[in-house]
């Protein structure tokens, strides 16, 4: 059983096997503004909202101190799995999307979902409670993202631009099928878009799914995946010392990345990875096994109690308004947002998004790639500018 526990916990992380001692001694980051934004000489204010199910979420509002101070429309950045809003600012200001958008005059807002170190609160629950971790990406979409969009909409009194990466695109697709959410969004730009996962090619992910490691984790009584816990770091240390090659762990989880600067791994590990829930991982694995874009599958009887149906309801991509402009960037070496699955998504949408396909780009390149500004972000910004209706910006 001990070897199984080691394998389960180790397999579910993107970064933990790369510099385990760094994770063990790194301290949690509590203020994105103080740690990354202010030192780069950008304006940043902290905001918080409470979701309908009681979670306290942190948002940051970022602006350039230059002449284009927040003259543009609001844009919400939604991170992916095991990440938080810091991922948009980890490279230099000339390379990081959050800073680049601010420099172009956008009113930049940074989302952080429940369970991350920035959004670790709840009105009644502690993070040590099992119930605190009883959520998956459908809750992140229907509660966290939907209510962040509502908050920005109420403050700016205008529709927002939405940017998502990886799990952030899963959340976006699900939320945008809801008319009351879609009507608050001006346009969406999705990096590594995912609604279907049945053609995942990342070798370690395929192995985990085949072995049903998500179900084994539940059997072991775990509810959160936190790669900064002493126990997990020590277990990963043990596994990587003579038992497996951990130097290429990122590729085995995400696919090959062309433009990710591996020399900055230790710096990135000051911030990533962030915690997530075991239930969330199980939901993602269900997507891989079943080939569906559906709500969480509790099994026949609990599905009946929860949904009134024997199978969980699917999110219908054709319910996203055809009038909502969309832009998507995806890569040929992405082991998670596989090209076949992206094409499946495109076939289900009622509109034809603008597309950027980069043959050599992988999953991490779109957020941390050193050449993403020229390869990706300038095209996204051109898309947004074409959708801005105000002539004053």
Curated annotation (Swiss-Prot):
GO BP term, example: response to gibberellin
Source species, domain of life: Eukaryota
Gene3D superfamilies per the UniProt record, alphabetical: alpha/beta hydrolase
Top EC category: hydrolase
Species for this entry: Arabidopsis thaliana
Stated induction or repression of this protein's expression: Stimulated during seed imbibition. Induced by gibberellins (GAs) and repressed by DELLA proteins (e.g. GAI/RGA2, RGA/RGA1/GRS and RGL2/SCL19) in an ATML1- and PDF2-dependent manner. Upon seed imbibition, increased GA levels in the epidermis reduce DELLA proteins abundance and release, in turn, ATML1 and PDF2 which activate LIP1 expression, thus enhancing germination potential.
Name the record gives this protein: Triacylglycerol lipase 1
InterPro entries, sorted: AB_hydrolase_fold, AB_hydrolase_lipase, Lipase_euk
Annotated glycosylation sites: 41, 261
Gene Ontology cellular component terms for the protein in this record: extracellular space
UniProt keyword terms in alphabetical order: Gibberellin signaling pathway, Glycoprotein, Hydrolase, Lipid degradation, Lipid metabolism, Secreted, Signal
pH dependency: Optimum pH is 6. Active between pH 4-7.
Signal peptide as annotated in the record: 1-20
Tissue localization of expression: Expressed in seedlings, roots, leaves, flowers and siliques. Specifically expressed in the epidermis.
Gene: LIP1
GO function term, MF aspect, one: triacylglycerol lipase activity
Signal is among the record's keywords: yes
Free-text function comment from the UniProt entry: Triacylglycerol (TAG) lipase active on triolein, trioctanoin, tributyrin and 1,3-Diolein, but not on phospho- and galactolipids. Involved but dispensable for TAG storage breakdown during seed germination.
Protein family (similarity comment): Belongs to the AB hydrolase superfamily. Lipase family.
Localisation: Secreted
Enzyme Commission number(s): 3.1.1.3
Involved pathway(s): Lipid metabolism; glycerolipid metabolism
Broad class of where this protein is predominantly found: secreted
